[in-house]
Amino acid sequence: MGMEAPELNVPAVFNLIDRFNKMDRLALSGLEDEVLVILDDDDGEPASVKVDMGNFTRLSRGYVSGLIAIDSSAIPIAYADRKWYLVFSAGVVLRSGGRYAPPHVFRVGPHLAEVGRREGEDQQGAARRLREYVEGSIMLEVLHSGALDDHALILVDGSLRGLSELDCSVARKMRTSLIGISKATKVVPSSMGSLPNGPGYSIISNDGCYAVTAARLEEYGVPLRIDTTDLEGLSSLLSSDVIVRGYPDSLRLAHYSSILSVSEEEAALTSLAMHGAALSRPLERREALLGILKVRG
């Protein structure tokens, strides 16, 4: 059985999220007379990861920790010149006191963002870049705030790519585990298929400030790429969150709370138009006002 851990300072974390939520994401005054081309859907490809199977380490339940799970959604809606315009939202879930403790769920957004276009980058690449920025910004805001107790866990959807040595040093000093869990990642199928039943992990690389692993969080759970600054944090995760089909429930809740509705997407386009942008096609007024029974994110 895991040991009891101090509870998260929920009001302090809530104030951080609320402050992040109120930050100005886009100076809409600069849109006047800008001609925006409204975008259609397009699926992107995840980053490639090669699994080098090594020794498989079994996981047992560890320390009961307070955890924060962060996920986001971003939808490209328009472009002009060399800029993408996206609407995004983030979900933040706090769980303290063990796997079955009631979660606190917060939502950031929806907000508009302007992202400079990189050479060869498509709209889904821009959306991934924005999601990484939003989730990473919230993660680092919480990490550097001092609002966390020892042995806290911060979970984000996706990898920990871009994490600096300074951030890792702060996490180690605060005894906080940063954990990135990728739902979709290109791996060698035969290698992932041969991953033993969990819970456990095999290290792919451990030469930076965080380890990259191929892991199962329950016996027959879906194999995942999991990045972590502290491998012991994976044991704490098993004691601190419900694992559903091999995936942490708190991250699942964060994902659902970040999903953007079609009416929110249409409202974002309306906001662009209200600030002087010339759209390439007229908006559907009924959908903008009422929405339809469909979600994206």
Could you describe each region identified by the protein language model?
Residues 1-60, 65, 117-297:
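Long, contiguous domain-sized segments
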